[in-house]
A protein has these predicted regions:
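N-terminal mitochondrial targeting presequence
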Residues: 1-71
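The feature marks the first
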Residues: 112-118, 126-130, 136, 141-168, ...
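Catalytic strand-loop segment that frames the active site of acyl-thioester-processing enzymes
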Residues: 58-140, 254-340, 353, 488-501
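A cross-kingdom feature marking solvent-exposed beta-strand/loop segments within repeated
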Residues: 167-182, 187-190, 215-217, 336, ...
Length: 501
């Protein structure tokens, strides 16, 4: 089977294959949640191993299908009862399904051995498309976050097989939209990925989103996916733990077998070395001389602003908060903690609200910057989220981008792209929203930080009759958030340049 610009369907079309596969999936066990969906995976054989179940199919249409029940490795009552029994014996369970790693033998795995994918045929299935549409008729990205994280988890377990450690999402290193895919009803999506780097007990997983105008064959390899159809890239880091000792677990080594696989491996290796070095340093890097002058200029300028206007809005006034009780329907495959994709979705929805209210328009998601899950979120805990606009950047016609008009309207780090399919292909405003999350267990009055999510959105100038606003920090803490936001915008711009060349 050959691929050109689109993935062509085999004889009989995707419709019959799709219906047959969907019926087959309904009988599989889904250890992530009890919600079935219509996604496909590359594995077709039956297995009693939880990792072989189509867990990545459990997150689609969660809100629409939460009244349906599918077979599951363990109900919440089963997991709750077992945990109580183990606690009486002085034992702590990390996972209900993964209680024995089966083997500690380490071998080599190729990228092809962990390759997995999901099909989201929006063009062929209008009701599936309806579950992924937002109020503006565009892609509801929060739904996609759940699928990305669940697929990454499936890939992690395929790489570790036959061992069965407890794999958890340690960080989301970046999710970036490369192209606009506004009319998703005209496309069939494929989410596909594999392990791209391994350490001793950690692994990086790269997932890409592809958009095709034609129907998609239910079977293909990674090499057959055309790069020109990529609209999204995502990188996750997973870590493995031994369910018996609760310590790190040595995983299979990745063996790159092609030039491109070695390039991806070295890139990931360099990034992880940089991330480890940054973790040893202070969480906040001191401002440079240029940034110090910027902070001083912002402080002076903010003193003269007595009230906000349509073009100037205080950072403190951009805050949105949300508090959620963590219910077991959104638990991960291990039963006792909340699924990371659900957290990404909830944080995104709040960030979207903040960006939409700030711009009085429908923002378009551009990127999720590096995010580390500092603490897992237990089922039965209270999750508090606070979102605020931390940085804005105005992209104007190139001839007007060379000078800073104020400390709050600096020379942008990004440039208007000549590619009409790119998000930043026209004048507009880049809005960065920071979402801080904290968790509180009911048996204590103290809360602890769970993670910080940084989402970037773009609002075209053409979507608003008046100029889009700049965010105004007033306190030193807010100004440092602004400075860090500008650093992140520059980092994203550099990353886009790297992958474009």
């Amino acid at each position: 089977m050959m691929f050109t610009k689109t993935l062509m369907h085999k004889s009989g079309g995707i419709s019959r294959a799709w219906t047959k596969k969907t019926m087959a999936l309904s009988s599989l066990r889904c250890p992530t949640t009890n919600i079935p969906s219509r996604c496909l995976s590359t594995e077709h054989h039956e297995s009693t191993v939880p990792a072989a179940a189509a867990d990545a199919t459990a997150t689609v249409n969660a809100d629409q299908r939460d009244n349906q029940v599918s077979p599951q490795t363990a109900t919440w009552l089963d997991a709750l009862t077992e945990r109580a029994r183990q606690l009486k014996d002085g034992k702590t369970l990390d996972s209900y399904s993964y209680i024995n790693p089966k083997t500690t033998k380490v071998s080599e795995r190729t990228r092809a051995e962990s390759f997995s994918y999901l099909l989201l045929p929006f063009k062929d299935d209008k009701w599936l498309c309806d579950a992924y549409i937002n109020a503006f008729g565009r892609l509801r990205v929060g739904q996609l976050f759940q699928d990305l994280d669940a697929l990454a988890g499936r890939i992690a377990y395929k790489h570790c097989a036959p061992a069965e450690p407890v794999n958890v999402t340690a960080s989301v290193d970046r999710i970036l939209m490369l192209k606009k895919v506004d009319e998703i009803q005209n496309y069939n999506f494929v989410l596909a990925g594999a392990v791209s780097w391994t350490g001793r007990s950690s692994m990086e997983i790269t997932v890409k989103g592809y958009a095709f105008e034609d129907s998609v064959s239910p079977e293909f390899s990674e090499d057959e996916l055309p790069l020109e159809n990529v609209f999204l890239t995502a990188n996750f880091t997973f870590v493995a733990r031994n369910p018996l000792t609760h310590r790190s677990f040595a995983i299979n080594r990745l063996l790159p077998v092609s030039e491109q696989e070695w390039i991806d491996y070295r890139r990931a290796e360099s990034y992880n070395a940089k991330k480890k070095l940054a973790a040893k340093n202070s969480s906040v890097i001191e401002p440079s001389d240029e940034e110090t002058r910027l902070v001083h200029d912002m402080w002076k300028a903010s003193k003269s602003i007595e009230a906000t206007s349509s073009e100037l809005k205080f950072m403190k006034d951009s805050k949105f908060t949300s508090t959620l009780f963590m219910q077991p329907q959104y638990r991960n495959r291990h039963s006792y903690m909340i699924f990371g994709g659900y957290l990404l979705r909830q944080a995104f929805e709040l960030a979207y609200c903040a960006a939409a209210a700030f711009t009085s328009a429908g923002p378009r998601f551009v990127s999720l910057d590096s995010t580390t899950f500092k603490a897992p979120v237990p089922v039965g805990s209270v999750l508090s989220m606070e979102a605020s606009v931390s940085y804005t950047e105005h992209l104007k016609d190139n001839e007007h981008n060379s000078k800073a008009t104020s400390p709050f309207d600096l020379v942008p780090t990004n440039k208007i792209s000549t590619n009409p399919d790119a998000f930043l292909s026209e004048p507009g405003t880049l809005v960065q929203v920071k979402v801080d999350t904290r968790i509180q267990n009911l048996d204590t009055s103290e809360s602890k930080e769970s993670g910080c999510f940084i989402y970037s959105f773009f609002v075209p100038a053409s979507s608003s009759k008046s100029p889009l606003a700049s965010v105004i920090p007033q306190t030193y803490s807010e100004m440092m958030d602004y400075v860090e936001g500008r650093r992140r915008a520059q980092d994203t711009a550099n990353y886009v340049d790297t992958i474009s060349n």
